[in-house]
């Protein structure tokens, strides 16, 4: 879901495709071709699982629903099944949509979602199909089915069977359901043949729905207000999936590949993300947002909780003691509430904020161009992927070129670094900054120097500011920004800060071994100190300097 068809050369394509006299011949051609993409074992397991001796015959919806773990989510199943029934007509989207799903149809869906299988299915320079486009086609298909007579396969593939994509609007509610469902797969479907347990994600469905809303808020401004009336343009969704949500495709493919295994053939899989809790800021749903926000070159397979402000205390020293021993990449999550009226908040609620305002240069009112989403939402959440170990940096900064700032609520935005050394951890009063210059600290006077795109936190971890004044700093603008020169800043009260250690099995094993050794060493030294103290006290008692109601003294 999310990649578009490329634009191949017409002459080459027309020669590479077989010729057809009728559209029924095209459907039969792909039905025959799709079976050849699977092994004999896979087809046998598929037929057994769905009682599909004849692949032309309809499959019981209940069996498909159970296989996709959607039996407890009727609304999601309705949206997913509608998409499957449309895709089974591939590539003829103007064909009437059937009321049932056939064996051939379901196999085609499995192949379309899988990159390698799809390349073999179409056998052209078109490398991928955008399934998001099909979500809004259902209303057009019956209307146009008698008008489209084309049998030119090259044209059909390039134009989605001559569909006018620009005119398609996808219902907002359907988009939210499908995106929320896809997000649940990130933490629940790790491989193509693992046993899946989605009961926890279903129980916390509203969290995934909230994450889906953040993504919808980014896709189109029409997501706010009357989106249910007019829908969201398919072109906007296509652009979003091609940029920020391409990482969801493998997880959906993993799930549909499950249909090629018998239930007894699925294997146990250790959930490497079982330590994520719906009580933390980094919930499973926010983790899914982080995954789709990171560059494809970055993978996070395991996480280790290092620091939680609400548990360990909001201080630079506490964060340093918990995080600095981790010698691998980390993920910092910052959540808070936007301050809508600086003067009112500083005067009536928190006088310390007045000092922060003095230290942090505000944008001029004319430059404050917050969009409708941010003006109507109070909660904000940011994530920062830190690709180097933390260190005290009162003069120099640290960080390599994979540093990434992500906004997770109320929108999904990603800002990737374009240079090295973009972060500081200033222990002399400057706090934490990503994308900013080192603050000027003179005695009790602090002056922050925010970058064009930057996230800044004061030394008490009480206030934060995300600033965006366009390109030109250490971070690139978001891929989905229609106007990347737009300036705004979001000032907020920090409610929680979390830092998680990232890495694969090898990195995590080494880090955990080191942490366990350090904790054991600290306890050993504590024992030695207590023993030494006991011995010293006994010696003093022997010479009569302490004990017997004496408190000690000089000799």
Curated annotation (Swiss-Prot):
Domain of life: Eukaryota
Keywords, in A-Z order: Cytoplasm
GO BP annotation list: protein-containing complex disassembly
Domain annotation TLDc: ranges: 280-503
One Pfam family linked to the record: TLD
Subcellular location: Cytoplasm
InterPro entries: TLDc_dom
Family, similarity comment: Belongs to the RTC5 family.
The protein's role, per its UniProt record: May be involved in a process influencing telomere capping.
Protein name in UniProt: Restriction of telomere capping protein 5
Protein's organism: Candida glabrata (strain ATCC 2001 / BCRC 20586 / JCM 3761 / NBRC 0622 / NRRL Y-65 / CBS 138) (Yeast)
Source lineage: Eukaryota, Fungi, Dikarya, Ascomycota, Saccharomycotina
